C-alpha cells in the first residue's frame, strides 16, 4: 500500500545506489519514492545515464506523474579552490552544464562542493569567487545553489559560518548528519544547524535492519532545537535492503517533519 507523500521527507539516489547500479532505471525511481510516502527526490549527477533533451523530458514527466518534487541535483565533483585557474574554469563549465540540466528537468536546487583546500583566507576567497560565478548562471536559470558541510574547506563550523556570511544569503546550506564522525557532530552540528535549509538525514545501520536510532534522533533533535523547518532527505549507505531501511528512517523522521516532537526540559 502506498503511503501519503510527505513534503518534508525525501530521499537521495545515493540511498538507492545499489539498486541503480544493479539495473533499476532512474526513470523508475520517482514512482518508487512516491510509493514510500516521500515527496522529494535528490539525484546524484552521476546517476543520470544521459542528459539529452529527450531523456530529461522523460524524467521530468516521470516526476510529475509520481507527484514527486525534484528538490536538488547533487553535483558530486569539482574543486572551486584549485590553485590551477584552468582547473577552476573546467569545474565552472561542468557545474554550468549541470545547472542547465537541473533547469530542464525542474530541479529547484543544485548542491556544489565549496572547495577541497584547507580553509585559509585565500581558499575562502577563491571559493567565494567561484560560487559567485556559479550563482550568476544559476540565477539566470531560476535554480538555487546550496553547499554542504563536506570536503576540507567546510569541514569545521567556523569556515562554514564565515563563507555563509560572505555570501550574504545568496548561498544555501545543506546539513549532513554523517559527514562529521564520532561525537564531534554533537558539538559542531548545533553551530551550523541555524543556517541550514535542508538536511541529508543519514542513519547508520551497524547490522542490516538495525538502525542506530539514538544517534539518528540526536541529530534530528539538534535540527529541531535550532528551529529547522526544511526537508529531511534520507541517506542510507549501509548493508541491508535499501527501501526497508529507508522506511524505518521515515517512521523516525515523521514526527519531526510534522512538528509533534518537543524539546526536553
Give the location of each predicted region.
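Histidine-acidic metal/acid-base catalytic patches
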Residues: 1-37, 106, 125, 132, ...
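Active-site acidic/histidine proton-transfer and metal-coordination neighborhood
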Residues: 3, 62-69, 75, 80-172, ...
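Residues that line or immediately flank small-molecule/substrate-binding pockets and catalytic motifs
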Residues: 13, 45-48, 77, 114, ...
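Short, conserved active-site loops that position catalytic residues or coordinate cofactors/metal ions
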Residues: 36-45, 72-78
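Conserved beta-strand positions in the central sheet of alpha/beta enzyme cores
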Residues: 42, 72-74, 111, 146, ...
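Glycine-rich, proline-tolerant flexible connector loops at the mouths of alpha/beta enzymes
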Residues: 42-64, 114-119
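Positions that flank functional sites
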Residues: 48-49, 78, 117, 153, ...
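Short amphipathic alpha-helices and their capping/turn segments at secondary-structure boundaries
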Residues: 53-66, 96-104, 185-191, 220-222
Amino acid at each position: 500500500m502506498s503511503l501519503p507523500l510527505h513534503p518534508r521527507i525525501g530521499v537521495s539516489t545515493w540511498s538507492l545506489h545499489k539498486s541503480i547500479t544493479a539495473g533499476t532505471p532512474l526513470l523508475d525511481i520517482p514512482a518508487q519514492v512516491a510509493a514510500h510516502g516521500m515527496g522529494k527526490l535528490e539525484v546524484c549527477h552521476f546517476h543520470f545515464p544521459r542528459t539529452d533533451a529527450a531523456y530529461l523530458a522523460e524524467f521530468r514527466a516521470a516526476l510529475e506523474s509520481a507527484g514527486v518534487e525534484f528538490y536538488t541535483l547533487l553535483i558530486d565533483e569539482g574543486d572551486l579552490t584549485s590553485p590551477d585557474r584552468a582547473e577552476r574554469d573546467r569545474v565552472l563549465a561542468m557545474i554550468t552544464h549541470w545547472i542547465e540540466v537541473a533547469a530542464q528537468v525542474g530541479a529547484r536546487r543544485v548542491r556544489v562542493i565549496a572547495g577541497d583546500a584547507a580553509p585559509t583566507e585565500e581558499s575562502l576567497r577563491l571559493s567565494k569567487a567561484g560560487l559567485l560565478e556559479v550563482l550568476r548562471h544559476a540565477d539566470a536559470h531560476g535554480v538555487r545553489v546550496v553547499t554542504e558541510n563536506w570536503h576540507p574547506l567546510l569541514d569545521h563550523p567556523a569556515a562554514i559560518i564565515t563563507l555563509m556570511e560572505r555570501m550574504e544569503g545568496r548561498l544555501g546550506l545543506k546539513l549532513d548528519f554523517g559527514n562529521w564522525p564520532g561525537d564531534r557532530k554533537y558539538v559542531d552540528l548545533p553551530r551550523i544547524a541555524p543556517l541550514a535549509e535542508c538536511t541529508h538525514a543519514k542513519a547508520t545501520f551497524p547490522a542490516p535492519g538495525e538502525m542506530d536510532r539514538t544517534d539518528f534522533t540526536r541529530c534530528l533533535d539538534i535540527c529541531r532545537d535550532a528551529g529547522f523547518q526544511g526537508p529531511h532527505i534520507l541517506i542510507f549507505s549501509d548493508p541491508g535492503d535499501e527501501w526497508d531501511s529507508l522506511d524505518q528512517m521515515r517512521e523516525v523522521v515523521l514526527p519531526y517533519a510534522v512538528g509533534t516532537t518537543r524539546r526536553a526540559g
